Each structure stands twice: as structure tokens, then as C-alpha cells.
Amino acid sequence: MFQIFDKLNKLIVEWLQKPIKEYENRSPFNLRDLESVMQPGDILLVDGNQRVSSAIKYLTQSTWSHAAFYLGKNNKFSEKFGTDAILIESDLIDGVITVPLSKYEKFNTRICRPAGLSDFEKEKVIEYMIDSIGLDYDRKNIIDLMRYLLPQPPVPIRFRRRMLALGSGTPSKVICSTLIAKAFQSISYPILPVIQKEKKLKEVSYRGVKHSQYIEKEYYHIRHYSLFVPRDFDLSPFFSTI
């Protein structure tokens, strides 16, 4: 039974990875441009060209279907990962792996950079990503995406994020954006928190005269990592678009 399921799983993966027709590269940047700008800790958002990319872009109403973490080039990690510009990403087949930045040279991309991170915090995020190499891709995500492609459902916008809480949530199995979200949440760095505003009536005194006024407070609640999608890094006020 397991062999049948595994074979079916592979067939679905192959189908999801087939390229879509009429993909257009609108990016004016080449590999050298990307390498000159990117810094370790940056996130590369990718407008993918596969069927799986279409499902993610449809559900998120966004250009971006994939997110990868930039490790850098010719730095202290080069001895282990090579001298090329290296990304860490979660792949549909191979799980969490390193790939050269050149993989996405012909794609539409955007660079998102976390703002205000100390060197220590950045190192912690990088360590988390490196320690994640070898984890499996969350295969429940494959079934979810297949469900939305056959055919693409007319889903109201307010329900799409709920549908994108993809995967089983198993710590040893990840998808691209949830892995990166977990890495930044490991240092309590906000990405796109839920903001709760609360007004309270408070009695204050000014020059001996008492009066009441409303005090407004904002509370930032961290989203569960499984709810993050690639476009959230683009929308986040805590990430700069380069």
C-alpha cells in the first residue's frame, strides 16, 4: 500500500513541476547584478514558472510563488557549500537544500532584507537555516496544491489565507515560506504580525482638574508560521524591498 501511495505521490510531484506556457521574464537584472546587491540573510522572492507556482499565486493573489534564503558568496560558509552565491530553499522533491543563485537568473525576482537585525541575530537566523538542511518537504502540501489545481476553485479572497495554512505542521517537514518564517521567529523577529488595537477610558488629572480620555494601545500578535506565504515578506514593514 505504501509503495502505491509513494508512486502516486511522485506522479503528482512530476505533474506539479511541469512548466506553464508563456512565462515572461520581465526582470532587467542578471546574475552579476543580484550578487552585487544581495547580502547574507536576504530573502529572494521568485515568480515561478511551474504549475505549482500558479496555484500559490492564485491563492495568495500575488506575483510571488517561492521564497529562498540567501547564504552568501565567498564567505565563511564557502568551505562547506562552495564558492558560488548560495541559497537555502525547500524543494518539492529534495526537501531543504542549497542551490546556486544562478538557478533563478532567468526568473522574475525581488529581494527582501530584514531591517534592524544585529550581527548576532542575523547569525542565529543563518544557523537555523543551515541546521534545517536535509529536512523533508511537507508532502501534505502536495495534496493540498493538487486539490486547488484540479480545477482552480472560485475561492473568496477572505478564505484564501486559511487555505494556504498548508502542510501537516510537523517540525521535521517544511515548505519554503514556513521554513524562513520559523527561522526569523526563532529570534522573535516580526514578519507580518496581527495588530490588535484596544481603547480604554482612563481618568487623568491636569492642574488639579480631573477628566477622562481614551488611551489607545496596540498589541502585536505573532502569526503561526504555517500561515506565512511568500508575499508576506514583500508586504512586511519589517523587511526592506531592495
Task: Go through the PLM ranges and name each one.
Residues 1-242:
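Cysteine-nucleophile amide-bond enzymes
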